[in-house]
Amino acid sequence: MELIEDCIKENKTCIVLVPEISLTPQTISRFSKRFGSRIALLHSALSDGERYDEWRRINRGEVDIVIGARSALFAPLKNLGLIVIDEQHSESYKQDDSNPRYDAINMAIKRVELNKGAKVILGSATPTLDAYARALKNIYHLLNLPIRVNKKPLPEVTLVDMNQEFKRSEGHFSLLLLNKIKEKLSKEEQV
């Protein structure tokens, strides 16, 4: 939110992508409390009239922030400063069920390349392997959040060599995972 605030102070605009349309009401509510009414909403569930009205507000410069699903990436914002992609790991950012097919993350990266000085933030507690590998190669800048929002400890992570597991057992799960699942179920906990 602070980076968005900084962008607006510099008279730049922002796009915030969420993976699902169902997440837009709570996102709009949160942003409206902080940034007021200069926010537009774009997604495929809007009526043609609603979509037209939002595009017109954006085109007139009445909007600083566009929030929506992947199609919001095409908003005609002027002076773009930042694109935030929440839950970057979500498959919802890939449009592959109809033409034109595109990956919203790749499109966002291309859009900021065309808008000199603009930035992309890929937010995720569980980034894709591709994004994580790019961060390790310093193509992306990785920011670790060592503390969860709710102050709960981070989960313990165990790497299992599945090549070895496939030699030992049949099936698609490691013995360690199967044992942990059995342990949780025996305590009537969710898995």
Q: Which ranges hold each PLM region?
A:
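Motif I (Walker A/P-loop) of helicase-class P-loop NTPases
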Residues: 1-5, 108
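Post-Walker A helix-loop "phosphate-sensing" segment adjacent to the P-loop in P-loop NTPases
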Residues: 7-14, 36-38, 140-142
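Conserved Walker A/P-loop ATP-binding site and its immediately adjacent core
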Residues: 7-31, 50
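Switch/connector loops and helix/strand junctions flanking conserved nucleotide-binding motifs
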Residues: 24-26, 49-52, 75-76, 91-94, ...
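Conserved motor-coupling elements within RecA-like helicase/translocase cores
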Residues: 29-66, 74-80
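Flexible beta-alpha connector loops of hexameric P-loop NTPases
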Residues: 39-48, 90-102, 163-171
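SF2 helicase catalytic motif II
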Residues: 57-122
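Conserved interdomain linker/interface between the two RecA-like ATPase lobes of SF2 helicase motors
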Residues: 105, 110-191
